[in-house]
């Protein structure tokens, strides 16, 4: 599955080539996707090439060929924006302010004292991956796990947070927000396209995303590359 930014770039290249017969320049792609630098475009093109959607033609400048399009592509359609929570959509790098929690209901077929929150897809506890871009289903959680604010759930993929007691297949409960204190476990959006679950630290002016597994290195980013999308407030684990 493509991330939103990958799909935006693929469709932009495709539509531009239909209109003019030549691919857009890197500057045009950067501006179209509202990215801060061309390095982000290079990463997106490499990802699209690895997934078999485009290929670079050798010995020719700006030579790209679109091999295939997403199955759900509609000619002339633009990728949808404005999903909530912003971890799923990125909000073009402008995280959404937390909103008052909507009224929640106790599920008719579940235990008393429970509320339902949306499960918004998967989050990486490992190398960053894209979260699924829609509400996959709802989850019943104890109301005393939530507190104030807007909440959502994500299913964990990976093992980088095992020493914090977070395992592959767990479901994490996230309070939506765009700030964090050092030591908080957060959902972080990296380069406006990929989400990861890590412990938040500051290293001078930079942001460190710290794993809880010695097999993974702490990753350091400039402050403009990381957007906080919420803090961990609870965890649900199923035993089979």
Swiss-Prot record:
The EC number(s) this enzyme carries: 3.4.21.88
Top-level enzyme category: hydrolase
- Assembly and oligomerization: Homodimer.
One of this protein's GO BP terms?
SOS response
Q: Does the keyword Transcription regulation apply?
A: yes
Alphabetically sorted, this entry's keywords are: Autocatalytic cleavage, DNA damage, DNA repair, DNA replication, DNA-binding, Hydrolase, Repressor, SOS response, Transcription, Transcription regulation
**Which reaction(s) does the protein catalyse, per the Swiss-Prot or TrEMBL entry?**
Hydrolysis of Ala-|-Gly bond in repressor LexA
Database matches in HAMAP family: LexA (MF_00015)
Name a GO molecular-function annotation.
DNA binding
CDD domains in the record, alphabetically?
S24_LexA-like (cd06529)
Q: Is Phosphoprotein tagged as a keyword?
A: no
Q: What does this protein do?
A: Represses a number of genes involved in the response to DNA damage (SOS response), including recA and lexA. In the presence of single-stranded DNA, RecA interacts with LexA causing an autocatalytic cleavage which disrupts the DNA-binding part of LexA, leading to derepression of the SOS regulon and eventually DNA repair.
Q: Which residues bind DNA?
A: 26-46
SUPFAM superfamilies the record matches: LexA/Signal peptidase, Winged helix' DNA-binding domain
Where do the catalytic residues lie?
160, 198
Stored PANTHER family: LEXA REPRESSOR (PTHR33516), LEXA REPRESSOR-RELATED (PTHR33516:SF2)
Task: Name the family the entry cites.
Answer: Belongs to the peptidase S24 family.
Q: What is this protein called?
A: LexA repressor
Q: Where is this site: Cleavage?
A: 125-126
